């Protein structure tokens, strides 16, 4: 099976999830109803759109541009919904209505991931589609940065939607979003965030215990989880931002990876296979070998 065939299948599956809802711009996490993943998560949608943006960069195909525009219009719509936790609301129904059932909210990685993505979109569209950028991209970014800065010191739920407190993953993507805002501040953005960013980087060091990265603290400051797949995802999703690597060298991520591999080899008798899940003793659907 060649790589081009695999890539085509992956893209096809992405497009199925993008085109599932009648409301353009909605991206389902999965067509599954059990577990119930047929929702538009702010986090998941932003990560899916990273792939679409990359495809547009490579191909300049109109369909990918249309996916991007649909996504932008939908996110602008979602930002204005009357939801329980505002921009920290983790997901919405695929018909565009708020999801108001009990859930782990707020989840403050979502707006940051969306913001990181939108700066990528900003950079690739600003010359060819300046009106689109000014009318859609910039206002979404501004609302997200205002929310993130206002809530930096407040606890939230982690990306696994289980722990309420402070989380390595959430804080890293927030830091990356703020850094991107600062990098673009000489153009259209003017909020002064340099000192906020520098202080936030200092606070990130709370997640270091020697060479070990602490994934989550509860609201009392107690360590809740250490070896967690979200630590590895954090490095990927901030695109190995150098300011972050200066604090958390990749050798520290390697320690987390090695511990996870060891734990899952023991759990599933994997011998030499390097397959991991979210974290050791994960009980959700028996804690299988997966993470976002």
Residue ranges with predicted function:
Residues 1-8, 55-72, 121-142, 182-201, ...:
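Structural helix-adjacent loops and short alpha-helical linkers that scaffold large soluble proteins
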Residues 1-43, 70, 74, 78-89:
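Low-complexity, Ser/Thr/Pro/Gly-enriched N-terminal "stalk/linker" regions
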Residues 5, 42, 77-105, 167-175, ...:
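Extended ligand-binding clefts on enzyme/binding-domain cores
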Residues 10, 17, 44, 71, ...:
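Alpha-helical packing segments of well-folded alpha/beta enzyme cores
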Residues 24, 150-157, 204-208:
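C-terminal ends of transmembrane alpha-helices
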Residues 37-151, 171:
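Aromatic-rich carbohydrate-recognition surfaces in CAZymes
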Residues 51, 117, 177-180, 184, ...:
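Core register positions within helices of long alpha-helical scaffolds
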Residues 133-138, 142, 153-169, 213-219:
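Short, surface-exposed recognition loops or helix-turn segments adjacent to catalytic cores
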